[in-house]
Curated annotation (Swiss-Prot):
It comes from Plasmodium falciparum (isolate 3D7). One of its GO terms (molecular function) is folic acid transmembrane transporter activity. This is Folate transporter 2. PANTHER family: FOLATE-BIOPTERIN TRANSPORTER 1, CHLOROPLASTIC. The keyword Lyase does not apply.
Length: 455
């Protein structure tokens, strides 16, 4: 899961600096909010935090399909494809929220309704006796609600970044992403610990509380009312025109190819639990280290890499990540025993480094969007970038399931797992062939001059 700026992107001054730097003209932020206490940012952080906190249920969901429904690795990969579908539809969701108002508002009602619906779906997992299909459908609805909520929050991030300096915009984007990482970090260990101490139904009930906090907090969100809706077809035309430039198409293709290759995560989860005997509490500890790594990746980017070019950042991080990514082969072939490294320590260190690199690769594209997005398309453009990533993730689940099945890897047969890990590693390197398609400083400067001349 890796994505992300001579940062050609980072050399761009926000186009909206053609307007007033205090954010005047932003469509959805009230004057009171701009001048006084910025409760909008608080809500944004709460959405990110809640999105991370709902990971409390992630291990319980894994074990639900693995132990309760007794599915094999390739079946679990297939099931976990469906929750990605709503995130692929983020541009559609964003166009809806950008175009259609509810009671004259385009953010607050969507945030309230879908966070409430998400909470109800977690309660359904806890209280209903479900079949595999029904449980999969509920996971789909949980993801649909999360997709709506994060799309609204991302639009608010972009809106609040417009009209500000690049540094201010960078801070807002990274703070939103960090709030997600903090949420995941807060519950990572307990996702496994609680699974050993209590029934998974209690975990689903506890998780349902976090979206409810969003529903309550957004009641205090100040938003300007709109008397009319925008034409969604005009919005779609503007969106296509805006993203149909080399500055976006190259990164879009790179991210999709990078994300769509097979990944050994699901098969390796079965290996760790069934072969190595790792308990849920250790799997929670593993997720805790991933949360810490995400924060460290964000810090490294902000301190050391935000002035590096996009191409350089992606090439270096991909090459560095390759040996780390295939390092579980040392575990599956028991080489770590000869090196005197325990199974647990080896798994913790490798996953930690991969997660940090993932965050470093994601950030430049997010920051690019926040700084050059034209007014009226805030949610749509940001969501399109994430949709490309999630389409790749959906494809990844499909290719992972297919190759896992071909290699006859199941719940207890891991004879070909090392070959599978190596295959996934080479798919990772394949994305480097698309680096020439990424924008350089000249392309960035042309876009900058073009947009400036429009102003």
């Amino acid at each position: 899961m890796i994505e992300k700026s001579n940062n050609p992107f980072l050399s761009i001054d926000p186009i909206v600096e053609r307007t007033k730097s205090n954010g005047e003209g932003l469509p959805l932020l009230s004057e009171k909010t701009k001048k006084g206490f910025d409760f909008t940012q608080i809500v944004v952080y709460l959405v990110g935090l809640s999105d991370g906190l709902t990971h409390l249920a992630s291990l319980a969901i894994y074990y639900l399909f693995k132990d309760y429904f007794r599915l094999t690795p390739y079946q679990v990969s297939l099931i976990l494809m469906y929750p990605y579908i709503p995130f692929i539809l983020k541009p559609v969701i964003a166009l809806i929220t950008d175009s259609f108002s509810i009671f004259g508002m385009r953010r607050k009602p969507y945030l309230f309704l879908f966070s409430l619906f998400q909470s109800l779906n977690f309660l359904a997992l806890a209280f209903l006796n479900l079949s595999v299909i029904q449980a999969s459908l509920i996971l789909f609805f949980i993801s649909l609600c999360a997709s709506f909520c994060t799309t609204v929050a991302e639009a608010l991030v972009v809106e609040s970044s417009m009209g500000q300096t690049y540094s201010q915009g960078t801070n807002k984007v990274t703070e939103f992403i960090a709030s997600k990482a903090i949420g995941s970090l807060s519950v990572a260990y307990f996702s496994g610990y609680f699974l050993e101490k209590m029934p998974r139904e209690y975990i689903f009930i506890a998780t349902s509380i976090f979206p409810l906090i969003i529903s309550l907090s957004c009641l205090f969100l100040k938003e300007k009312e709109y008397s009319t809706n925008r034409n969604i077809f005009n919005q779609l035309s503007d969106l296509i025109k805006f993203i149909n430039t080399p500055i976006f198409l190259g990164p879009f293709l790179y991210i999709f190819v990078y994300m769509s290759g097979p990944d050994y995560d699901d098969a390796f989860f079965f290996f760790c639990t069934n072969k190595l005997g790792f308990r849920p509490s250790f799997m929670g500890t593993l997720r805790l280290t991933y949360g810490i790594a995400s924060l460290i990746g964000i810090i490294i980017y902000r301190v050391f890499l935000k002035n590096c070019s996009l191409r350089k950042t992606l090439i270096i991080t991909t090459l560095v990540s390759f040996p780390i990514y295939i390092s579980p082969i040392i575990l599956t072939e028991h080489i770590n025993k000869f090196l005197g490294i325990s199974n647990e320590l080896f798994v913790l260190s490798g996953g930690f480094l991969i997660e940090a690199i993932t965050e470093i690769q994601l950030l430049p594209l997010f920051i690019l969007t926040a700084n050059i997005c034209q007014p009226g398309l805030e949610a749509s453009v940001f969501a399109t970038i994430l949709s490309v990533k999630n389409l790749g993730s959906l494809t990844k689940k499909g290719t992972s399931s297919f190759i896992t099945y071909l290699m006859k890897i199941d719940s207890y047969n891991f004879d070909n797992l090392s070959l599978y890990i190596l295959t996934c590693g080479f798919f990772l390197l394949f994305s480097l062939t698309l680096v020439p398609l990424l924008p350089n400083e000249e392309h960035i400067e042309k876009l900058k001059n073009k947009e400036t001349s429009k102003g």
